[in-house]
Curated annotation (Swiss-Prot):
Keywords assigned: Cell membrane, Membrane, NAD, NADP, Oxidoreductase, Transmembrane, Transmembrane helix
SUPFAM superfamilies: NAD(P)-binding Rossmann-fold domains
Organism: Pseudomonas aeruginosa (strain ATCC 15692 / DSM 22644 / CIP 104116 / JCM 14847 / LMG 12228 / 1C / PRS 101 / PAO1)
Family named by the database record: Belongs to the staphylopine dehydrogenase family.
Superkingdom: Bacteria
Gene Ontology CC: plasma membrane
Reaction(s) catalysed by this chain's protein: pseudopaline + NADP(+) + H2O = (2S)-2-amino-4-{[(1S)-1-carboxy-2-(1H-imidazol-4-yl)ethyl]amino}butanoate + 2-oxoglutarate + NADPH + H(+); pseudopaline + NAD(+) + H2O = (2S)-2-amino-4-{[(1S)-1-carboxy-2-(1H-imidazol-4-yl)ethyl]amino}butanoate + 2-oxoglutarate + NADH + H(+)
Transmembrane segments: 7-27
This protein's name: Pseudopaline synthase
Localization, UniProt: Cell membrane
Length: 433
């Protein structure tokens, strides 16, 4: 472990799931001060507390070419109750689902967190930075940083061992925006993530970084549609695969068309908020998963934004067809490459109280898109494609609730009113213009 980085100070991880375990390892390698974690009370938190009491530490296993990321990290303190926090922390890292940012920030005892200089949002959506700033108490001078998305693919290996996680992939590049463009924390986090081989590109505004959250563009058209929801909300039959072509998965010409139209709607929202939109195909290829130039020539990628709608949809379809297998994996003896797209949908399941719950995909994607649509209304944008996807989700979930019975379903299945949060984002945006 390196010497403590004074610009980070003591770091509190808010939320202690798979993402926090990866972040903790990166912070320990870089050199933070004290490292603590806060997790909301519940059965999982109790298991964490019991494991820590037995002397367990955070354990990360890197898979395949990322095996070198493996390691352990000890926590200096763990809290289940925000009321236990003291003014010991200079950096807060929000490792919670993005749709819970507002509730989490409002639930922190800011009267005892006067030393906090920086908040990092690990996977921000469009407007998240403004939303968090709107919830900070008057006089709070903390800088809020937005990462475009979480920079790895990490999961807890076994829920009975909540301190162990597996990282199977790491992004090549993520984007970072700050509420204060000249703040030194941007360079600090660039160095922290470089330790895992991730390039951090600073952008002029938080909204510019948030507009590069890949799940906003991909999950919504693929996983809020009829095919995906039929598999997610069913206990019977094959689960289907998230990134395969129909009939094995949700990818059809229609879904690709929805992706293109959603990108156009999001691009206009970003423009009105003063942020530069992205070239969707270049973003998907260069920053996420590339394909061979035989399938997508460089000129087609770079000229995507200027192409016509039909050409754009063709190029997007070619990309996802090219990623049915990992194009850069070695072929086996039969000449077959790794079945990259065979990621099964997670289905609804009953929680420990016997209530039906949706998996994070598509629940978080629905909530994020609902908030973006409510925000867009302040900029006189109708976003018909986004609204169509929201309606698809709401209708499918409503039918599921009717079938199972309302008493059997967790309240999180019901639609939410995103307008108050959107109003707060818009007021904060107006105050900074």
């Amino acid at each position: 472990m390196n010497a403590a980085d004074e610009s980070l100070g003591n770091v509190l991880l808010v939320g202690l799931g798979a993402v926090a375990i990866q972040v903790a390892l990166d912070l320990r390698r870089h050199g933070a001060g004290r490292l603590g974690a806060l997790n909301h009370p519940g059965r999982r938190s109790q298991r964490i507390a019991e494991a820590l009491a037995r002397g367990a530490c955070l354990q990360l296993e890197g898979q395949g070419q990322h095996r070198w990321l493996s390691g352990n990290a000890a926590l200096d303190v763990f809290h289940q109750d925000p009321a236990e926090l003291r003014d010991d922390w200079q950096t807060l890292v929000l490792c919670v689902p993005a749709d819970s940012y507002l509730d989490v920030v409002r639930g922190l005892p800011w009267e005892r967190l006067g030393g906090v200089r920086t908040l990092l949002l690990v996977s921000a959506f469009i407007g998240a930075n403004l939303l968090v700033r709107s919830a900070l108490p008057a006089g709070c001078q903390a800088t809020v940083l937005s990462l475009s998305s979480y920079y790895a693919a990490t999961k807890v290996i076994d829920e009975t061992q909540p301190l162990r996680a597996l990282t199977k992939a790491v992004k090549r590049r993520v984007y970072l925006g700050s509420s204060r463009p000249d703040c030194p924390a941007r360079e600090t986090w660039r160095r922290v993530l470089a330790g895992s081989g991730v390039e951090v590109v600073p952008l002029a505004t938080p909204e510019a970084a948030e507009g590069r959250n890949v799940t906003t563009y991909v999950h919504s058209p693929f996983f809020l549609g009829e095919f995906a929801l039929a598999r997610i909300l069913s206990e019977q039959g094959p689960p289907g695969f998230m990134y395969k072509l129909y009939p094995e998965g949700p990818i059809t010409p229609g879904a690709i068309g929805a992706m293109r139209r959603l990108w156009c709607e999001l691009s206009e929202l970003l423009r009105r908020m003063g942020a530069e939109p992205l070239n969707l195909l270049r973003f998907l290829n260069d920053d996420n998963y590339p394909v061979h130039e035989t399938m997508l020539p460089r000129a087609s990628i770079d000229g995507f934004a200027e192409a016509g709608a039909e050409r754009q949809e063709y190029l997007l379809f070619v990309r996802y067809a090219a990623l049915l297998v990992d194009p850069f994996s070695p072929a086996d003896e039969q000449g077959r490459h790794f079945d990259f797209s065979a990621v099964p949908f997670r289905r609804v399941s009953r929680d420990e109280d016997g209530l039906w719950r949706l998996p994070r995909v598509p629940l978080e994607d629905y909530r994020k898109l609902a908030l973006i649509v409510a925000l867009a209304a302040h900029f006189d944008l109708a976003m018909p494609q986004a609204r169509s996807l929201l309606a698809s989700y709401e209708n499918a979930v409503s039918r599921f609730i009717d079938c199972q019975g309302a008493s059997q379903c967790h309240p999180s299945l019901y639609p939410i009113d995103s307008r108050p949060a959107a109003d707060a984002i818009y007021r904060q945006w107006c105050s900074t213009c």
